[in-house]
Amino acid sequence: DEIQKDDEGNWLHVIPRERMKVKSEKIPFDRKTPLSPQAVELLENTPRIGFHGSHLIFPNINKGKRSAFTRDAVRALIKRMHDKQRKIDGIGWVDPDQKDRTGKPRIVTLHGCARATFNTWAKDARGYGHKAFPRDLRESCLDHRNESYQCAYDREQALGDMREVFDAWGEFCFSEIK
């Protein structure tokens, strides 16, 4: 993953396609996500902790390791918070719409929470007070693609439109902080 500027000086988070879940040859371009001014400010002001020469924003410095913060660390944190909440309310942090193999509600995941929160916000223009964003643009922001037709015609992402969505999302996410 890499943070870089485009030709107009706008910041992007770029993930090479080969590192993405969808690695189809029908999607020839890397995943680019425009960064909102709030995201850029957060990244610029986040102290770099770790080891000399580290380029990692959130390094794993546990037990002397010098690597990136992992999904497993986040999963373990969510599991601990779930267990603590479950002792309080008997339920914990579960998604009632998602079931495990035994039919019980699954513990929430960072991936699911983040995507569901973004998609709910992006769909509800009236409720959240932003411009309405078309479904295909919301899906593009989530990197959801229907290979059978979309990939045949989409040669690149609509970064200008996506930037508008992510700028509004940044405003919403930071609206209670400033």
Language-model features: locations:
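Non-transmembrane alpha-helical segments in soluble domains
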Residues: R75-I78, K123, E139, F166, ...
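C-terminal catalytic core of tyrosine-transesterase DNA break-rejoin enzymes
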Residues: C113-S148
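Active-site/catalytic core of tyrosine-dependent DNA strand-transfer enzymes
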Residues: P34-V108, G112-R126
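Glycine-rich, flexible loop segments associated with nucleotide phosphate handling
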Residues: G9-P16, K26-K32, D100-H111, K131-S140
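Short secondary-structure junction motifs
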Residues: N10, G53-H55, F133, S148
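Conserved tyrosine-mediated DNA breakage-rejoining catalytic core shared by Y-recombinases
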Residues: D1-N45
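Catalytic-site neighborhood detector that most strongly recognizes the C-terminal catalytic loop/helix
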Residues: I3, R19-K21, K63, C141-I177
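Active-site-proximal structural scaffolding
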Residues: D6-E8, P28, K32-S36, G112-A116, ...
